[in-house]
Regions:
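Aromatic/histidine-rich interaction motifs
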Residues: 121-138
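N-terminal regulatory/effector-sensing and dimerization cores
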Residues: 30-125
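Generic detector of well-ordered alpha-helical segments enriched in charged/polar residues
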Residues: 21, 116-120, 137
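A short, N-terminal "cap"/entry segment at the start of jelly-roll beta-barrel domains
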Residues: 1-34, 51, 128
Length: 138
């Protein structure tokens, strides 16, 4: 099976330079919560990412269309449109787009002393209900 980390038509991604992240980690305000990477993958067919070696950031993934799945430890979850999940820092994990209905996702890597508070109880899929005048659109 084909497995792609990135390279999707229309994707957008920004990885902050290490020097910038280091400065944010030293600053009293931004050391509490800051992003390190941010992106958008539309119709990400064959998207797959596995991290056997844990990373020191939390990973927020918001699925706006399609479906996918993710694994934290031995627990596997399915995710569909208008759901998000947060992968914990320091824990091996994997995630993948559904090959028949590939997801469109926004994703953010974040860290900081307050990051665990924002990620609390978000290891399972959480629903988002966009409304007519919501800033979240699908």
């Amino acid at each position: 099976m084909v497995k792609l980390k990135d390279g999707f038509t229309g994707e957008r991604a920004l990885v902050l330079p290490r020097m910038i992240v280091d400065k944010m980690e030293e600053d009293p305000l931004t050391s509490m919560l800051h992003i390190t990477d941010i992106g958008y993958y539309p119709k990400a067919k064959y998207h797959f990412r596995e991290r056997k070696e844990p990373i020191n950031q939390f990973v927020f993934i918001y699925c706006i269309d399609g479906a996918g799945s993710y694994r934290i430890g031995d627990q596997e979850y399915n995710v569909s449109a208008n759901q998000y999940f947060i992968l914990p820092a320091g824990v091996p994990h994997s995630y993948a787009s559904n090959p028949s209905t590939p997801w469109t996702i926004y994703w953010i890597h974040f860290k900081g002393t307050a990051a665990p508070f924002y990620a609390k109880d978000a290891g399972r899929p959480m629903d988002i209900k966009p409304e007519r005048h919501s800033r979240i659109s699908t």
